[in-house]
Amino acid sequence: MAAGAVVGAWMLVLSLGGTVTGDQNITARIGKPLVLNCKGAPKKPPQQLEWKLNTGRTEAWKVLSPQGDPWDSVARVLPNGSLLLPAVGIQDEGTFRCRATSRSGKETKSNYRVRVYQIPGKPEIVDPASELMAGVPNKVGTCVSEGGYPAGTLNWLLDGKTLIPDGKGVSVKEETKRHPKTGLFTLHSELMVTPARGGALHPTFSCSFTPGLPRRRALHTAPIQLRVWSEHRGGEGPNVDAVPLKEVQLVVEPEGGAVAPGGTVTLTCEAPAQPPPQIHWIKDGRPLPLPPGPMLLLPEVGPEDQGTYSCVATHPSHGPQESRAVSVTIIETGEEGTTAGSVEGPGLETLALTLGILGGLGTVALLIGVIVWHRRRQRKGQERKVPENQEEEEEERAELNQPEEPEAAESSTGGP
């Protein structure tokens, strides 16, 4: 009963701003105000009292009194004789003593041992494993706690029970860092385990932070549940409930993978195994940037969706296994319905138009070639005719000149 009353009084004192009386060990939160009462001091001046401090801020005992000056912003004596620390820091840890003399001459001493604390943020497990392999060391993850004072400790739990490192099946690598300015601590704890063959298949791990001061509750991380697989070496088989991966089959709906524009195609990868394998999708030989899943839905199929699809199933105890490939194609729709062999439709019209344009261009090119060839022949013919005409003119001139000479001779010899 007495112990309960003491604890209740302690909590009441701290809730009222940290005011305490008597010889006590007290804790104060960093950054909060703390008031220490000087027992036996008169409530009003004149007062005969003296405070002596030995903390991280002092090299020896420092003396404060009501008549003296306050110690900067660190501490000062209140009118009622109490000592006020406006914002407690790590350097304020230490011993505080007050000696007061009442008006009747009775002397009273008060001694305090002050420790400070800071609650860190909730711890968390970073880089957690996705699965564990039986019989070999595995890293479960790293537990991190930041911003606490004093440092405290980190503990790992398996299925709610504390794990004790034994250097064999369980090992822990710890690291403690202190911030150079704030003095607060950051803790790291890396857990390595070697699951036993035939042990639990779904162990649950968690981590807790235990403060360095008593009467402070622990902080816990969110639990993580991992799957344990057996090690396939030396002919050892899988765990009892494991089913090996067999043939991977890819089913397409509608059958054949042919669909009208805007239709829907559903691809289902069937890979029976226990546990279920991870399934990734491949199109035209390239992996698709999609999350793993056994079903691929292609709504409102367009030209960009056409191609060859396959799925790859990856099982922890096997290598990746790929299914056969299936093709997804678009069939055109005519005015009277869907016909696979129809010559109508925008696709064929575009093809016919393209062929017509190409044919016209070819005809024009042929005509231009014929015209150029014909003109070249005409030029060559004209070049040949020019010399022939010149020779004929010269011959004609020669013929015309020859008959005139004999006639002239005859006329000259035919006189009386």
From Swiss-Prot:
Signal peptide: 1-22
PTM field: Phosphorylated on its cytoplasmic domain by PKCzeta/PRKCZ upon ligand binding. Phosphorylated by ATM following DNA damage.
Membrane topology: Single-pass type I membrane protein
Every Ig-like C2-type domain range: 123-220, 238-327
Start and end residues of each stretch annotated as Disordered: 377-416
Molecular function terms from GO: DNA binding; histone binding; laminin receptor activity; RNA binding; signaling receptor activity
InterPro entries per UniProt: CD80_C2-set, Ig-like_dom, Ig-like_dom_sf, Ig-like_fold, Ig/MHC_CS, Ig_sub, Ig_sub2, Immunoglobulin_dom
Pfam families linked: C2-set_2 (PF08205), ig (PF00047), Ig_2 (PF13895)
Top-level taxon in the UniProt lineage: Eukaryota
Any one GO BP annotation for this protein: regulation of inflammatory response
Acidic residues bias locations: 389-408
UniProt keyword terms in alphabetical order: Cell membrane, Cell projection, Disulfide bond, DNA damage, DNA repair, DNA replication, DNA-binding, Endosome, Glycoprotein, Immunoglobulin domain, Inflammatory response, Membrane, Nucleus, Phagocytosis, Phosphoprotein, Receptor, Repeat, RNA-binding, Signal, Transmembrane, Transmembrane helix, Ubl conjugation
Protein name in UniProt: Advanced glycosylation end product-specific receptor
Annotated organism of origin: Bos taurus (Bovine)
Gene name for this UniProt entry: AGER
